[in-house]
Swiss-Prot record:
Function, in words: Catalyzes the adenylation of molybdopterin as part of the biosynthesis of the molybdenum-cofactor.
Domain of life: Bacteria
Membrane-spanning intervals of the chain: none
NCBIfam families: molyb_syn (TIGR00177), PRK09417.1 (NF006932)
Gene that this polypeptide is encoded by: mog
Organism: Helicobacter pylori (strain ATCC 700392 / 26695)
Catalytic reactions on record: molybdopterin + ATP + H(+) = adenylyl-molybdopterin + diphosphate
One annotated GO biological process: Mo-molybdopterin cofactor biosynthetic process
GO cellular component: a single term: cytosol
Family according to the record: Belongs to the MoaB/Mog family.
Pathway entry: Cofactor biosynthesis; molybdopterin biosynthesis
Name of this chain's protein: Molybdopterin adenylyltransferase
EC number: 2.7.7.75
Amino acid sequence: MQTIHIGVLSASDRASKGIYEDLSGKAIQEVLSEYLLNPLEFYYEIVADERDLIEKSLIKMCDEYQCDLVVTTGGTGPALRDITPEATEKVCQKMLPGFGELMRMTSLKYVPTAILSRQSAGIRNKSLIINLPGKPKSIRECLEAVFPAIPYCVDLILGNYMQVNEKNIQAFRPKQ
């Protein structure tokens, strides 16, 4: 079984300064560990809400570490320093707006302010990048919604084959 390389990038001014513990990055690792049977290698970073820092980390995770999947958390709202979607779009060759649409639709079931989210997803080379919200509960809800499409997307961009733990989540792959 192939090892899946996963980048986890937390964008947070306060967590990057050690003001509080980053629970969101840990939540991403926990959920993906439940969903995948493959051996997983996580590359984890916390950076401030600075566009150039986010872009550099995304590029490093995609190009140097050759992550199959890069998941960001934080910086997707309308606040002045929330710039994760812009950094993601800058480094991607293709954007996948359906991921953000589904995550917003899912989150709207729980909170009306989900309409303020600017989550997105895109492809850089052979890496799928997905922007998630900043709260662990919302991370789980959004990953549960979009994960069924992730393994097939990674297949299409020639990433490593993801073995899904079907006891915890179902993925969709069209019959070949």
